[in-house]
C-alpha cells in the first residue's frame, strides 16, 4: 500500500493502475468505510482511498475542530482491507492560497441538509470534484447513509460530464441498528442508548408504508413518536420525500425515502430508509 500527501506524487503513481475504484473518506474509519473499500477492491483492478477532513463542508458552528482523527489507525485498517493507494493531503494541498472557486449544485442540494447546513453541499461538491480530477477513477463508492449527498454527487457528475460511475452501497449498522458513523464515538453513554431509536423510527414508518399507508403526515408523525418516546427531542427533520428530488409529496410516491436528522447532545445523527 502506497501513501501520498501531494497531488504530484499521487498522480505519478496512477500510471501503474489502469482501472481504479475510489473511496473518498474523512478518516476515523469504521466497518462501513472498510466495506466500501473491499467492494471497490473486488470490482476494480485496484482501489484508492482519500482521507481528508474537508473544512469547506463544515459550517461555522459545526464540529470541524472536534471531528475525530486517527490517521495511523486508518492506514493500518486500509492496509488490512486491501487498499492500494491512499491520498492523505493537508488542507493547504487541496486549498492553496488564492483558491476561490466553488461548485454550487442546485435542485436536490437545496433540500433538507441543504437548508439545515448552508454551504455544506457546495463544500462537498467542490472537494469531491477536485478528488475525482486528481484520482481519475472509473468508479467511486459512497454509503447510502448519506443518501442526499449521494444524490448531489450523481447530479454534478452528470451535469459536469465527469467520467466516473457512482456506486452507492448499503448502510452498515451496529447490532442494535444504529447506522455506523465516525461521529458515534462522541456520543455520551446516555445518548448512545437512545440512538437506535432512529432505526426503529424508520422501521415503524416502513411497516406502515408496506401496509399501504401513503399519507406523509401519518408516516412522519410515526417517526417523530418513536424518537420522542426514546427521549430524542431535538429533531431537525423526520420526513418522507421523493428519492429522486428529495422533495416532500402528498401523498408520497412509491419511490419514497424516509430520512431523519436528530441532534443527540453534541452529535448530529442522520439515517434513512428507502420505503
Curated annotation (Swiss-Prot):
Beta-alanine binds at residue 57. The keyword Ligase applies. The active site is at residue 33. It is an enzyme of class 6 (ligase). (R)-pantoate binds at residues 57, 149. It is found in: Cytoplasm. CDD domains: PanC. InterPro entries: Cyt_trans-like, Pantoate_ligase, Pantoate_ligase_C, Rossmann-like_a/b/a_fold. Keywords: ATP-binding, Cytoplasm, Ligase, Nucleotide-binding, Pantothenate biosynthesis. Pfam families: Pantoate_ligase (PF02569). Belongs to the pantothenate synthetase family. Homodimer. This is Pantothenate synthetase. It comes from Gluconobacter oxydans (strain 621H).
Amino acid at each position: 500500500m502506497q501513501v501520498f500527501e501531494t497531488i504530484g506524487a499521487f498522480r505519478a503513481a496512477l500510471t501503474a493502475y489502469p482501472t481504479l475504484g475510489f473511496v473518498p473518506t474523512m478518516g476515523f474509519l469504521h466497518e462501513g468505510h472498510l466495506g466500501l473499500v473491499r467492494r471497490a477492491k473486488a470490482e476494480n483492478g485496484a482501489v484508492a482511498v482519500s482521507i481528508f477532513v474537508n473544512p469547506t463542508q463544515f459550517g461555522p458552528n459545526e464540529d470541524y475542530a472536534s471531528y475525530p482523527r486517527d490517521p495511523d489507525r486508518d492506514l493500518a485498517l486500509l492496509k488490512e482491507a486491501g487498499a492500494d493507494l491512499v491520498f492523505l493531503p493537508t488542507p493547504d494541498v487541496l486549498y492553496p492560497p488564492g483558491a476561490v472557486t466553488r461548485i454550487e449544485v442546485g435542485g436536490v442540494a437545496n433540500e433538507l441538509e441543504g437548508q439545515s447546513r448552508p454551504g455544506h453541499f457546495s463544500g462537498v461538491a467542490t472537494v469531491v470534484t477536485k478528488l475525482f480530477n486528481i484520482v481519475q477513477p472509473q468508479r467511486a463508492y459512497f454509503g447510502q447513509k448519506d443518501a442526499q449527498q449521494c444524490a448531489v454527487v450523481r447530479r454534478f457528475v452528470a451535469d459536469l460530464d465527469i467520467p466516473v460511475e457512482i456506486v452507492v452501497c448499503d448502510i452498515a449498522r451496529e447490532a442494535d441498528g444504529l447506522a455506523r458513523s465516525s461521529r458515534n464515538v462522541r456520543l455520551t453513554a446516555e445518548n448512545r442508548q437512545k440512538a437506535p431509536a432512529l432505526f426503529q423510527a424508520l422501521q415503524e414508518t416502513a411497516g406502515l408504508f408496506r401496509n399501504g399507508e401513503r399519507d406523509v403526515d401519518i408516516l412522519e408523525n410515526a417517526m417523530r413518536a418513536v424518537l420522542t418516546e426514546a427521549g430524542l427531542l431535538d429533531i431537525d427533520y423526520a420526513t418522507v420525500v421523493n428519492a429522486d428530488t428529495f422533495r416532500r409529496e402528498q401523498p408520497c410516491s412509491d419511490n419514497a425515502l424516509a430520512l431523519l436528522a436528530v441532534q443527540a447532545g453534541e452529535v448530529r445523527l442522520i439515517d434513512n430508509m428507502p420505503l
